[in-house]
C-alpha cells in the first residue's frame, strides 16, 4: 500500500470516548445549578460555627448553629429538587444526543474495521499472487496468460463492493 497514513485498527484505543473532561463537567454543572454549592457552603459554615461554639461552651449559639445547619440542608435539598425539575427536559435531550453520538461512532468504528479487513484481504491476495509467481519462476513454468481472480459469475453481473457483502450473500443464499 502506498498510502502514508496507517490503517485504523480495531485494537486502537477509543480516544474520543469522553466528550468532556471532569473539570468541564463540574463547571457546566455549577453553571446549571448554582444554588446547590451555595447550600453546601452554608451547611459547612453552620457546622464550623457549631463546632466553635461547642469548644467555647456557648450552648445557645450551638443550638442556633445546628438549626442553621438544618435550614441550610433543607435549602440544598429544595435547590436539588427544583434544579432537577427545571433541567429535566435538557437532560433528556442531552442523553438522546449522546446516544445518537455513540451510535454514529460505533458505525464509524465498524466501517473502519471492515475497511481494515478488506485492506488486509487485498494484501493477502497480493502476497499470494507474488508467492505463486515466484514459485512458477522457480519451477520454470510460464505464467498463465489470463489470470482472473475476482471474476463475476456471469458476464452481466457486476462484482459486489466488499468482502462482507460477498460473505453475506453466501450466508443468506443470494449468490
Curated annotation (Swiss-Prot):
PROSITE patterns: HIG1. Residues 118-175 are annotated as: Disordered. InterPro entries: Hypoxia_induced_domain, RCF1. GO terms for biological process: mitochondrial respirasome assembly. Residues 125-142 have a biased composition (Basic and acidic residues). It is a multi-pass membrane protein. Residues 106-139 form a coiled coil. The keyword Transmembrane helix applies. It comes from the Eukaryota. Belongs to the RCF1 family. Associates with the respiratory chain complex III/complex IV supercomplex. Cytochrome c oxidase subunit which plays a role in assembly of respiratory supercomplexes. This is Respiratory supercomplex factor 1, mitochondrial. It comes from Botryotinia fuckeliana (strain B05.10) (Noble rot fungus).
Amino acid at each position: 500500500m502506498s498510502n502514508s497514513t496507517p490503517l485504523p485498527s480495531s485494537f486502537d484505543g477509543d480516544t474520543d470516548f469522553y466528550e468532556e473532561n471532569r473539570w468541564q463537567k463540574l463547571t457546566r454543572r455549577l453553571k446549571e445549578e448554582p444554588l446547590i454549592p451555595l447550600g453546601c457552603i452554608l451547611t459547612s459554615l453552620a457546622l464550623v460555627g457549631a463546632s466553635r461554639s461547642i469548644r467555647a461552651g456557648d450552648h445557645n449559639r450551638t443550638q442556633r448553629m445546628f438549626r442553621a445547619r438544618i435550614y441550610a440542608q433543607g435549602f440544598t435539598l429544595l435547590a436539588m429538587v427544583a434544579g432537577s425539575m427545571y433541567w429535566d427536559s435538557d437532560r433528556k435531550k442531552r442523553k438522546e444526543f449522546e446516544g445518537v453520538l455513540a451510535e454514529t461512532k460505533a458505525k464509524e468504528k465498524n466501517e473502519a474495521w471492515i475497511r481494515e479487513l478488506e485492506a488486509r484481504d487485498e494484501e493477502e491476495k497480493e502476497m499470494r499472487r507474488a508467492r505463486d509467481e515466484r514459485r512458477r519462476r522457480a519451477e520454470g513454468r510460464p505464467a498463465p496468460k489470463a489470470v482472473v481472480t475476482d471474476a463475476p459469475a456471469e458476464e452481466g453481473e457486476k462484482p459486489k463492493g466488499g468482502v462482507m457483502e460477498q460473505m453475506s450473500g453466501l450466508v443468506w443464499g443470494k449468490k
